[in-house]
């Protein structure tokens, strides 16, 4: 009996999730229940202002922790316990 109730509850919640999910093909006017609000928030996001996009790198002669090429910490990409400048 308990197992049956759990199965029914899981099926109900799964169906509810699919019914209430936002369909990106719908425009902001055709969405159900406050779809405009979510659509507007999605469009107002400024991904260029994200701190995750701004990675600072270490200049030459700074300690770089991970000694291998291409670790992303050094601007040159070469690290042998200190960042090594690349000569072009």
From Swiss-Prot:
InterPro entries: Conotoxin (IPR004214). GO terms for cellular component: extracellular region. GO terms for molecular function: ion channel inhibitor activity; toxin activity. Keywords: Cleavage on pair of basic residues, Disulfide bond, Knottin, Neurotoxin, Secreted, Signal, Toxin. Residues 1-21 form the signal peptide. Disulfide bonds join 57-75, 64-79, 74-83. Residues 22-53 form a propeptide. It is found in: Secreted. It comes from the Eukaryota. Its main location: secreted. Expressed by the venom duct. Belongs to the conotoxin O1 superfamily. The presence of a 'disulfide through disulfide knot' structurally defines this protein as a knottin. The cysteine framework is VI/VII (C-C-CC-C-C). This is Conotoxin MaIr34.
């Amino acid at each position: 009996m308990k197992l049956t109730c759990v199965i029914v509850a899981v099926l109900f919640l799964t169906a509810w999730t699919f019914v209430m999910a936002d369909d990106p093909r719908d425009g902001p006017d055709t969405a159900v229940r406050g779809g405009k609000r979510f659509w507007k928030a999605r469009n107002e996001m400024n991904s260029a202002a994200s701190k995750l996009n701004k990675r600072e790198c270490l200049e030459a002669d700074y300690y770089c922790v991970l000694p291998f090429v291409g670790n992303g910490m050094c601007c040159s990409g070469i690290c042998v316990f200190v960042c090594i400048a690349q000569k072009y």
